[in-house]
Amino acid sequence: SPHSFILYKTYKMENKIVALIDADSLIYYEMGKETLEIALDGIDSRINQMLQITGATHYAGFLTQGKCFRYKVAKNRPYKGNRKYGDKPIIFPAIKEYLKQKWGCTVITQLEADDLVSVFHKDKTTIICSPDKDVLYQNIGSHYNYGKAELVVVTKLDAIRFLWKQVLMGDSTDGIEGLPKVGPKTADKLLELVQPLDMPEFVLNKYIEKFGISNGIDKFAETFKLIYILKSQEDVLRETGIELPELVTYDVESQKENEWL
């Protein structure tokens, strides 16, 4: 239950508990509301609920701005090329700006919010808040899925298995090509008896079996880079050449006080 989650986190970490908020989805959840005022109230309500349920003392929010590095990595198919965006509602930019101004959400060029919450995640002292399966299941620790309002606990083995399962399958949502005719059940079956340390080589060999050595290695590398969520400063430097600034967090109690000003 949410209450046991708070007790668990407080017991584990007596001092600072930082909620790392992947704020992209918040905009999509609220942009269909009748008025901007209702949408912004919805944003406040959702974030306050997150902070309360996770028992966070501090928070940091992140947004995606423009195209990330994965658009250049994708050679076989355009990254997220199958998404039908259409025209965004007129209140979309206002909600995004509100998240930056009111809640201090950060944007870093070339990186998705997914990457940013993951890079700053420190297992025992942070809680990732996101509805995104890749963010939740590629990171070890206790996370909060704010789309389903539920706690997700991910072990090291869970995270390794999820990553390699996704590399086998690809991700149709983001237009990422995997092995042909490999869905969740087939991927699970293929990895069933494979030890975690052997998974990279095993999956690479499956690509080589299907596409030949040269093509197989290229396709494997591309799919891996598109699926893999960056998790360290080294990852970020390698993929983008960017040196990340220090994490700035906001005090939850101070934010509550500001609401009365």
Sequence positions of predicted segments:
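General helical secondary-structure elements
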Residues: 5, 71-73, 161
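Extended two-metal-dependent nuclease catalytic cores across DNA- and RNA-processing enzymes
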Residues: 10-11, 81-260
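Noncatalytic, basic helical substrate-engagement surface that gates or grips nucleic-acid strands
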Residues: 14-124, 129, 140-144
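Short, Lys/Arg-enriched N-terminal segments with co-localized hydrophobic residues
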Residues: 1-12
